């Protein structure tokens, strides 16, 4: 009877196109009923008394409907939510181990902070393959912190085993391993056609001439370089002092300590201006050769770029989006609030230019709060008053839809020449364009050389353009825009396919992240450089939400505020469904986008280390009930909660849910919470938690809250 029910049930399911568990249950229930009916009729003896050969034949007949039902397993998985649950189960199982470590990603040569949960443990030591074990710092409540810069792992490995010794008992964990290829950024030009640029991803500084480039490892994350006095000066993100590279290639730390957290640097003569976002946000101005500090000033927002405009310094920030003009001693001379932060900056004594996705407040109000319109804005170098605004996105005959755009997308780097012409690298449409004060705009497609130029510099009659994504540079004649030379510092796609296929997946996913969609926007439009623009947007919804940083997402499924995306690769649907997809096919974009996003590490916190205060902060974290949802070691349980149970004043759909985020990399990510209501972490614990449902923060003293904020900023 079981055989008959199975055969008949599969046949009914196949014929009906069953694609859910409910439909399968109905099909087999109907089959069972029909067989029962048959057994009560004269057909029963014949069915029950089938010969062995006839039974085998019946089984073979069942193969066809079985295969038909099996072919719809993906639809079945989607209908029942199994596809969504699978990644979450995997990540939860990893975090639920008695001894667990997070994040699940090790980046070669990159400083990282890992957390281990080992309840009741006294001593924890963590060993990465090829490295001596590191003793972890106990923060209390079974939570341990490990600061490491793994260097001994074979760079070809895609995953590695990490050993965790807990009071002598050894536990193993398997973590993803990523060894980034060089990403040339921040091209600077010196005398006699010398150039330099940094690759923070691979921890290198490149220098020389285009046809004979050399590289030198610089620990701590080289963030920017500049030529001063015949030497190359390098600002390092994780180290407090500048690094210099002499002509013969020797390296030495020099000059006054500026503090950790350098993000940008510019030079003018012997002067250096460094923007930093470490334990403090500051602009530091030095006379490099004299070794003296000319000025140091606090900055309210998160610094993005810095440039000299003659005897003045221009600084761009996000959170708030702002353009600032400062004197050499750091004093604020003028400022201008922006609708969206500047994605690129160039300055000269005659003009300042920025690239942004929205400069005109009225246009943004009229066209929606997720409106993206790439624009170039020229401003007066004395008053910051705008003198010219040029939307750059445009449509060519390659597009089918009137609203589509495929040129002038994603201006990522700007440079002025001596004739006030502005050269613009468009990362999202792979082109270089020249905007002149008194001549038509000219441009050249660089797509046949590399994808996504993200750097540009002027060297006499030569324009240098570089692609961080493809690891390549070209030189162009400044007048004709013809390519005259090229160089490569990273492997080609063909070399990666042969030697490191996963790194090719990462590169192709990075391309999808920066590539413009038919609607003219890209992931980079809001997630500047993989981080955030610090603004609140919506994508197809009614409620604004702050842009999330996309670094450190590996192992934290599901994704987005409501957890509606089960896999990182599923975020590709945003580009397809909301922005009409891409013009060019590029293989399995889901898989490559997932590979890229999973390769992005959590930045090391640059907050001051104070173990005693961290321990007090974690204790307040536990007493307030934060660990109930944000449990170590990932500081999330990967659960969802109805929004109104936590924020009863939430104006959206009462059924809206909130995916519990991991509380890593919070420093400098304001605004906070699902709707950006908190402008600081302290507000998260006070005014933004008026109902006291987002943790029992009322039970904390003022000192407790200060310690808790300190702890959160170190994660």
Regions found by a protein language model. Give the residues of each.
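Membrane-embedded alpha-helical segments of integral membrane proteins
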Residues: 3-40
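Cytosolic-side transmembrane helix boundary signature
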Residues: 28-58, 474
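Internal/C-terminal transmembrane anchor helices
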Residues: 50-72
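Predominantly soluble domains enriched in secretory-pathway, periplasmic, or organellar proteins
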Residues: 52-53, 89, 109, 113-119, ...
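Hydrophobic alpha-helical transmembrane segments in integral membrane proteins
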Residues: 65-86
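Proline/serine/threonine-rich low-complexity linkers at boundaries of modular beta-sandwich domains
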Residues: 83-98
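Low-complexity "stalk/linker" and mucin-like segments enriched in Ser/Thr/Pro/Ala/Gly
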Residues: 101, 129-141
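Periplasmic c-type cytochrome electron-transfer domains
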Residues: 185-186, 245, 321, 326-328, ...
């Amino acid at each position: 009877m079981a055989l008959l029910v199975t055969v008949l049930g599969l046949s009914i399911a196949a014929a009906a196109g069953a694609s859910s568990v409910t439909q399968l249950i109905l099909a087999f229930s109907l089959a069972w009923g029909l067989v029962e009916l048959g057994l009560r009729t004269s057909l029963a003896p014949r069915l029950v008394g089938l010969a062995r050969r006839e039974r085998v034949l019946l089984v073979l007949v069942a193969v066809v409907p079985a295969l038909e039902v099996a072919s719809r397993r993906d639809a079945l998985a989607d209908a029942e939510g199994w596809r969504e649950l699978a990644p979450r189960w995997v990540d939860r199982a990893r975090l639920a181990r008695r001894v667990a470590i997070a994040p699940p990603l090790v980046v070669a040569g990159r400083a990282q902070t890992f957390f281990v949960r080992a309840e009741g443990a006294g001593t924890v030591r963590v060993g990465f393959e090829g490295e001596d074990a590191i003793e972890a710092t106990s923060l209390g409540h079974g939570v341990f912190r490990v600061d490491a810069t793994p260097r001994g792992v074979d760079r070809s490995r895609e995953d590695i085993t990490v050993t965790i010794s807990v009071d002598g008992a050894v536990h193993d964990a398997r973590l993803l391993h990523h060894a980034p290829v060089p990403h040339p950024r921040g091209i600077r030009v010196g005398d006699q056609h010398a150039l330099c640029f940094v690759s923070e991803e691979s921890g290198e500084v490149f220098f020389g001439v285009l046809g004979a480039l050399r590289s030198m490892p610089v620990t701590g994350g080289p963030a920017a370089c500049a030529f001063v006095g015949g030497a190359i000066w390098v600002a390092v993100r994780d180290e407090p002092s500048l690094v210099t590279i002499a002509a013969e290639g020797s390296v030495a730390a020099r000059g006054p300590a500026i503090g950790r957290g350098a993000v940008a640097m510019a030079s003018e003569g012997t002067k250096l201006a460094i923007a930093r976002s470490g334990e403090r946000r500051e602009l530091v101005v030095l006379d490099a050769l004299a070794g003296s500090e000319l000025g140091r000033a606090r900055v309210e927002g998160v610094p993005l770029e810095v440039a000299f405009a003659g005897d003045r310094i221009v600084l761009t920030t996000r959170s708030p989006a702002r353009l600032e003009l400062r004197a050499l001693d750091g004093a604020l001379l003028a400022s201008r609030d922006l609708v969206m932060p500047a994605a690129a900056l160039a300055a000269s004594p005659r003009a300042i230019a920025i690239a942004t996705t929205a400069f005109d407040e009225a246009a943004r109000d009229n066209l929606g709060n997720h409106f993206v319109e790439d624009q170039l804005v020229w401003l007066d170098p004395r008053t910051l008053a705008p003198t010219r605004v040029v939307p750059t996105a445009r449509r060519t005959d390659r597009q089918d839809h009137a609203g589509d755009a495929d040129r002038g997308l994603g201006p990522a780097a700007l440079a002025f020449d001596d004739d006030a012409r502005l050269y613009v690298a468009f990362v999202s449409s792979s082109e270089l364009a020249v905007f002149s004060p008194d001549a038509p705009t000219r441009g050249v497609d660089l797509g046949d050389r590399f994808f996504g130029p993200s750097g540009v510099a002027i060297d006499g009659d030569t324009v240098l353009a570089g692609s961080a994504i493809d690891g390549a540079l070209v030189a162009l004649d400044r007048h004709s825009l013809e390519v005259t030379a090229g160089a490569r510092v990273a492997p080609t796609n063909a070399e990666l396919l042969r030697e490191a296929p996963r790194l090719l997946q990462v590169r192709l996913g990075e391309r999808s992240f920066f590539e413009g969609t038919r609607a003219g926007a890209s992931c980079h439009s809001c997630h500047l450089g993989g981080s955030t623009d610090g603004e609140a947007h919506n994508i197809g919804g009614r409620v604004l939400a702050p842009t999330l940083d996309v670094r450190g997402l590996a192992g934290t499924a599901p994704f987005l505020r409501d957890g509606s995306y089960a896999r990182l690769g599923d975020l590709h649907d945003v580009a397809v469904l909301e922005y009409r997809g891409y013009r060019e096919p590029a293989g399995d974009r889901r898989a490559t986008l997932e590979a890229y996003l999973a390769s992005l590490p959590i930045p090391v916190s640059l907050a001051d280390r104070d173990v005693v205060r961290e321990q007090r902060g974690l204790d307040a974290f536990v007493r307030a009930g934060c660990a109930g949802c944000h449990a170590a070691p990932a500081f999330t349980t990967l659960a969802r909660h109805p929004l109104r149970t936590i924020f009863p004043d939430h104006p959206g759909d009462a059924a809206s849910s909130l995916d519990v985020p991991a509380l890593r990399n919070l420093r400098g990510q304001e605004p906070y919470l699902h709707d950006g209501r908190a402008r600081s972490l302290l507000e998260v614990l006070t005014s933004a938690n008026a109902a006291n449902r987002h943790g029992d923060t009322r039970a904390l003293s003022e000192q407790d809250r200060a310690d808790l904020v300190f702890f959160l900023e170190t994660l």
